[in-house]
Design a protein with these regions (language model features):
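Short hydrophobic/charged patches on amphipathic alpha-helices used for structural packing
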Residues: 66-69, 73, 88, 96-98, ...
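Conserved AMP-binding A3 loop
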Residues: 1-16, 151
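Conserved beta-loop-beta connector loops within the AMP-binding
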Residues: 157, 171-190, 213, 229-232
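Short Gly/Pro-enriched turn/cap motifs at secondary-structure boundaries
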Residues: 159-165, 210-211, 217-218
Length: 259
């Protein structure tokens, strides 16, 4: 396990980026925060971003689908962040069968890749329960607190995890190098911006191999994730490099098999 050193700037930059790109995120909103506080997603978004934005954090100490469903109905939150398994559970929640979810202004999925099929099911579920929003996917890792890109509101591209936050830059490089690849070519996702970590604690070798200065002079976080970026800047996540399977000369990813 690697300890990650994050600064006040890292957390504050994340909060500013999320609030700036989500006009609905305003004082008085309520966020139903299910993600654990020891997780970058839970601390960085469920607590810090919510409080910076003047929102009320409704904390759920331990996930239980029935309790969560009851809170959705009773508290009428405006924002719910979660992971794909949470949304899978909500689809099966009997307590939500006739629930009115028109209170929702933002539904976000992160922490793991959401399949195209599951996203469609969740979107249909939200629409059937009077919500005017779709689930928006994001991508990030603890090395940049949590999310660093997000699907724009009402502008989804199938399979995409969104576009980078303001002041955050993405590039796709040939794995093991700093060579930037052209649009739509698959390689390692690299991130640069104000939310990128300071270092791995007491691990200078790992820090040096992960945070690299490229020819453009910027420090880039090499994520270890495979993906691509199209001509419009939309990012597509494939898989962790270490999970890639090579068979008959082809690169195969578990996520592709699931979809």
């Amino acid at each position: 396990m690697k300890g990650i050193s994050l600064s006040n700037l890292n957390f504050n930059a994340l909060a500013a980026q999320i609030i700036a790109t989500n006009s609905f995120f305003r004082p008085g909103d309520k966020m139903l925060a299910i993600m654990p506080m020891f997780h970058g997603f839970g601390l960085g978004i469920g607590i810090h971003t919510a409080l910076i934005g003047g929102a009320c954090c409704i904390l759920v100490p331990k996930f239980n689908v029935n309790t969560y469903a009851e809170l959705l109905i009773k508290k009428q939150p405006n924002i719910i962040p979660g992971v794909p398994t949470l949304f899978e559970a909500l689809l099966r929640a009997e307590k939500l069968e006739n629930a009115d979810l028109s209170c929702l202004k933002g539904v976000f999925s992160g922490g793991d890749s959401m399949s195209i099929e599951l996203k469609k099911k969740v979107d249909d579920f939200l629409k059937a329960h009077n919500a005017s929003v779709q689930v928006r996917q994001g991508y990030g890792l603890t090395e940049c607190v949590t999310a660093s890109c997000l699907t724009p509101k009402d502008y989804n591209r199938v399979g995409s995890i969104g576009v980078p936050f303001p002041d955050t830059y993405y590039k796709i490089v040939k794995p093991g190098t700093t060579q930037e690849l052209d649009a739509n070519l698959e390689g390692e996702i690299c991130v640069s911006g104000p939310s990128v970590m300071l270092e791995y604690v007491d691990n200078p070798e790992e820090t040096h191999s992960t945070l690299r200065r490229h020819e453009d002079g910027r420090i880039w976080l090499h994520t270890g994730d495979l993906g691509k970026m199209d001509e419009d800047g939309f990012v597509y996540f494939s898989q962790r490099i270490k999970r890639m399977i090579i068979t008959s000369g082809y690169n195969v990813y578990p996520g592709q098999l699931e979809n």
